């Protein structure tokens, strides 16, 4: 068939094959075969198609004739044919298909035409045809010399193709070639409105992002498209480098403000961490109800604005931002869920389920370590409920079952039980401030700080109570009061509190532990603010300490304070890293890495993660270890345990990978895979840090693959790996009441029944799993996982960095540092109010959140939902939407406290 077809091919006579060299022979035979194939296809064409093909060929030939009067009608007809060819989206329109072989001829005809209307007309047609050719951006070239008629007339596919070519062309032109960019900009100004009007908002955004002109979006957006455009822009933020990410956020923010969507704009201003902008958005909104909603959002994020007193409803707004009602709203939720009954640690341990060989529970002997564990568990489980069975009735009895530092932590747990209840809580703690035991007094001071965590009070009770003890003769008293102040004023950047604390670091009586805790507290108070006084004081303290002092395990808190001060500030840390160069190794590497990872927390910065992986892959030989026996970073009283030395900064690097990647899901998935490798092949220092990193990447989100990994390493031969893995299990399941995790931990409790340290960790993990009886979360992200609370990250980092030396800090005397988690505790609830802020129960659908970025129409945002009546708990990755049209939410993200308005268009 093919042979016959080839013989009959009319084109053959035109081939110059006789004189061509052999390469051309091959080409010509290929051409023949293709032509033969086309001939076959010709035979398959329907009558209609054949007629169309002949007509188009005749039109092209007419353009090649000398009679110019025929050009215009021929071009008109060609254009009509191309435009009217309605076809499926999956195949090339027929006219374009049939004209494709004549593309070269049409270009020749165009070149030979006299300038004028006809020539422009021909350019338009060639531009459309160029879509089917893989030429050198000829679609754009001929568009620019064409008649400049409306883009829309050629259809969507043409506009999309043109947009792609504009973007490529733009990138090849330098800034100097402005004149050549002008016609491209004119085209863009046509393409963007067309895309906006035809449900292709994301294509318009992509084009403007490619040519770095995102600001042009604002004027083309209408009421219907703005939410989609802004959703697309904000979801691109994770994937573009500085400073483009800020430009995208600012563009979306401008769009929201244009349409008076203040809550959404405020959320983006918080993402930018631009406090002036936050204040500007808040004050420029004249709707009091919306302002109250924004005040709730600021309160949740831990931001407090000093409003002028002439602002309408000043007192209400200040009270909401201060989180004064947080405790009463939380207790209302608890009553609604019927979980007010206090729990005792045994309810959590479920010891009656443990099948010991001797019948009943084997470890009934009261040991100070187990009582300490029970103090923490009791605090975690009854957190914020205001009552328990160990401390609130007759606390002294329980406190004296603990020893020394155990008393401090046990007394402080009272603060956790009374969390956020400033007025009622402080009166209950007050009696312990007069105890004869310094440890109990110190714990009570810490409890005062904990109660005030996240809540502002005009009277400043925490400052009034704790300030007298900051320079107390007893270092024990200093610890409680300083850490208490750090927790009470975390994120406030209050100058008066910092002025009180900073001198403690340089005080001659302060032990290394006190200096470290002071640095930590200052870092928490000034978190993410780059406060100059905090930076200079901590740096000075580091410089003044001798090499031996810097080997103390508590020295790690000094650079952590520095890092927290610059949390999320990116390149602002260059000067600090330079200043740290004078410090001797190994402390220098440790401090540098720690400050560096804090600066990029939650940024998802891939380059930083690569640097950290390089640090993780460094290898320290055993010979070096022998020589460096004197260069120890951690002091370790147990000489059998070889302390970590040069590789200490590697542990920080591992934590850093999690800290940077936790911001976006793809990065977190990739980090997860990396951690698997590190656990198998890494140095001991690395392996000890990996469980902590896994905890950070999945806080309060008990994913099975992570739990299984941690469960495996909770039986590791290296005790520190197993301690950290067990604690990490608690962090991953914190506040979820996850049944599978609870069962795992009960099995571990039996497995480690004879090992007090591991058992202590299991108990802590059990307490965390049932945090606030399953109503609280430690996850630093909120508002649909868009916003990272810096205070929460500071609290988590405080604890995790301390766990890098779990044996000396957590299992030593400094377990009080676990209360750093208080800064991250938040209720995971949705409560709805009416405009007068009265609780308003409405039905809501709660289901798994679905990513709807860039989808056409109005797709469903949740799947697999159940309908509940507010107040309701939201798990990780869940989203809520109203199930009734009677009310409209003031903010689109239903989380935390939401104000609802009556829907004016609602008909009963």
UniProtKB/Swiss-Prot annotation:
Coiled-coil annotated spans: none
Name by which UniProt lists this protein: 26S proteasome non-ATPase regulatory subunit 2
Modified residues (Phosphothreonine): 9
Modification N6-acetyllysine, positions: 551
Chain intervals with Basic and acidic residues compositional bias: 24-51, 623-643
Phosphoserine: residues bearing it: 29, 147, 361, 363
Entry's Gene Ontology BP terms: proteasome-mediated ubiquitin-dependent protein catabolic process; regulation of protein catabolic process
Ranges of the PC repeats in the UniProt entry: 409-442, 443-479, 480-514, 517-551, 560-589, 692-723, 742-757
InterPro entries assigned: 26S_Psome_Rpn1, ARM-like, ARM-type_fold, Proteasome/cyclosome_rpt, RPN1_C, RPN1_N
GO CC field: nucleus; proteasome accessory complex; proteasome complex; proteasome regulatory particle; proteasome regulatory particle, base subcomplex; proteasome storage granule
GO MF annotation terms: enzyme regulator activity
Keywords assigned: Acetylation, Phosphoprotein, Proteasome, Repeat
Residue segments, region Disordered: 1-51, 623-645
Keyword Translocase among record annotations: no
Domain of life, source organism: Eukaryota
Assembly with partners or alone: Component of the 19S proteasome regulatory particle complex. The 26S proteasome consists of a 20S core particle (CP) and two 19S regulatory subunits (RP). The regulatory particle is made of a lid composed of 9 subunits, a base containing 6 ATPases and few additional components including PSMD2. Interacts with RPGRIP1L. Interacts with CRY1 in a KDM8-dependent manner.
Polar residues bias locations: 10-20
Positions carrying Phosphotyrosine: 194
